Regions:
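Structured alpha/beta or helical-core interaction and ligand-binding surfaces enriched in interleaved
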Residues: 1-159
């Protein structure tokens, strides 16, 4: 009996830290649209956290989220629900293209109760879980060069 080893990718793109719409960055964020499409296809449910000042992102998610809750400690808004075509359009496209579509402070995606994707700090840190070899290669091909030089991979607990 053979089992496929599943891989987790831990991606860091420091130049994206705190990036907000309209702020120039040295890293192209063109990778976001195909990466978001990829991770959302693997997901059943989503959780997105928007900081209070992320009004554009909040307006995008308000009509498509099943549940919305304000976090007491920092006033951030948390959105939950099933991944639907409407959610995919909002998360993938944002209000525009390029860096304007990477508006999300935190994203967690799950499939059948297992976490499959986590994004933090507007994309500075991303984790993908349970990838096959082919899926890993696909994701690595999508990433900007800055992330390729700073990535680490782990398979079944080894780094």
């Amino acid at each position: 009996m053979t089992t496929d080893k599943l891989t987790s990718l831990h991606i860091t793109i420091p130049d994206l830290k705190g990036m907000l719409p309209g702020v120039e960055t040295t890293v192209s964020t063109a990778f976001w649209v195909p990466l978001a499409q990829f991770v959302l296809r693997r997901s059943g449910t989503f959780e997105v956290v928007c900081m209070r000042e992320d009004t554009g992102a909040i307006k995008l998610l308000m009509p498509v989220a099943e549940t919305i809750e304000r976090r007491r400690e920092d006033g951030a808004l948390m959105f939950w629900g099933a991944v639907t075509p409407e959610v995919t359009r909002a998360v993938v496209g944002g209000h525009g293209s390029g860096h304007e579509s990477l508006w999300w402070w935190q994203i967690a995606l799950t499939c059948d109760g297992d976490q499959v994707f986590v994004l933090q700090d507007y994309g500075e840190h991303m984790d993908l879980f349970g990838l096959t070899g082919d899926e890993t290669a696909t994701v690595l091909d999508l990433l900007p060069f800055a992330a390729r030089t700073a990535r680490s991979m782990s398979a079944t607990g080894t780094r």
